[in-house]
């Protein structure tokens, strides 16, 4: 045990700094230190307890690895460039209470974690969870969510990697091999791409709103085209058998003519493409457009295609809305 601090500032060493299971009462200061250890740890601080804080700034690790596995420090004060790349850092299990004098943005911190969360080819999620916890406690909620999103993406990537390995071991059993490959493909499509893209694995729930707006825009285009080319009819059996509708039903754009200011349908719900698209895409909203108007498969190609597209937009809208609502609910519960 070290009752005071351990000051390694500006040292140059080719021997391992062994702090395994050491308790340091003060700081561990490695500012501007240079390490060049051929076949071992440059610093081995596994299970170390650093009560006064770890200062790791402007350090250079030419050769050797760093292990802070299961170490704890009250304060982390570092810069990203001092941590070596190439899988030479082990941060798994490392905990710290706060970050002072170091970067707090997600981009820089993710680059740091990328250096220290893979050890012997195996992904370790704990460094991401720890960083997110500290960032959230410090008030950096947005950066914390980005860190957790990246963690989950890498966890799923690791899961698929293990599935592929399992698939290789079951090549001699055709059914098991196909089942494993199918599971990996379905996992990639529905969990990774769908859930990740729409909600950031639940950590970016409001991202789904962008996709809803995009869906509304995409649905509004064929809706407008179908209306312009006479592909819509009133969504009412009573109106469709009425004499007023029958009198106009063979005109080029019967719906537009019937609902004009001088015709019987002038008081019917006015068609608006964006409102219709919103009604179509968002299932929890009822503006009244889809109740009033429906595309017809017998009134030209525009109406026919809109009839089919309405199913697509409705189903996709349900999926996006459901995932977004579930993600938002989850975030509210976590907060």
Model-derived regions, located:
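Hydrophobic membrane-insertion alpha-helices, especially the h-region
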Residues: 213-221
């Amino acid at each position: 045990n070290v009752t005071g601090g351990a000051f390694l500032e500006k040292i140059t060493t080719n021997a391992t700094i062994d702090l395994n299971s050491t308790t340091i009462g003060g700081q561990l200061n490695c500012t501007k230190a240079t390490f060049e250890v051929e076949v071992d740890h440059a610093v081995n601080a596994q299970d170390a307890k650093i009560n006064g804080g770890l200062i790791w700034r402007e350090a250079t690790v030419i050769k050797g690895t760093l292990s802070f596995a299961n170490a704890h420090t009250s304060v982390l004060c570092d810069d990203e460039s001092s941590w070596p790349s190439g899988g030479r850092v082990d941060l798994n299990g490392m905990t710290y209470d706060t970050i002072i004098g170091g970067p707090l943005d997600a981009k820089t911190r993710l680059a740091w974690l990328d250096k220290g969360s893979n050890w012997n080819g195996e992904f370790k999620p704990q460094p991401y969870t720890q960083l997110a916890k500290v960032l959230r406690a410090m008030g950096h909620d947005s950066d914390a969510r980005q860190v957790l999103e990246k963690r989950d993406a890498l966890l799923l990537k690791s899961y698929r990697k293990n599935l592929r390995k399992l698939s290789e071991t079951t090549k001699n059993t055709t059914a098991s091999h196909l089942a494993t490959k199918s599971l990996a493909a379905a996992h990639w499509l529905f969990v990774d791409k769908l859930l990740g893209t729409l909600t950031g694995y639940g950590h970016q729930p409001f991202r789904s709103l962008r996709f809803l707006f995009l869906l509304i825009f995409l649905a509004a285009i064929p809706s407008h085209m179908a209306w312009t080319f006479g592909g819509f009819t009133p969504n009412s059996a009573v109106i469709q058998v009425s004499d007023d509708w029958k009198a106009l039903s063979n005109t080029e754009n019967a719906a537009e003519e019937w609902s004009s200011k001088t015709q019987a349908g002038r008081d019917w719900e006015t068609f608006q493409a964006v409102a219709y698209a919103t009604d179509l895409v968002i299932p929890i909203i009822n503006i009244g457009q889809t109740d009033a108007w429906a595309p017809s498969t017998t009134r030209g190609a525009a109406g026919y295609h809109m009839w089919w597209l309405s199913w697509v937009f409705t189903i996709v809208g349900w999926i996006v809305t459901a995932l977004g609502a579930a993600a938002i609910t989850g975030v509210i519960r976590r907060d």
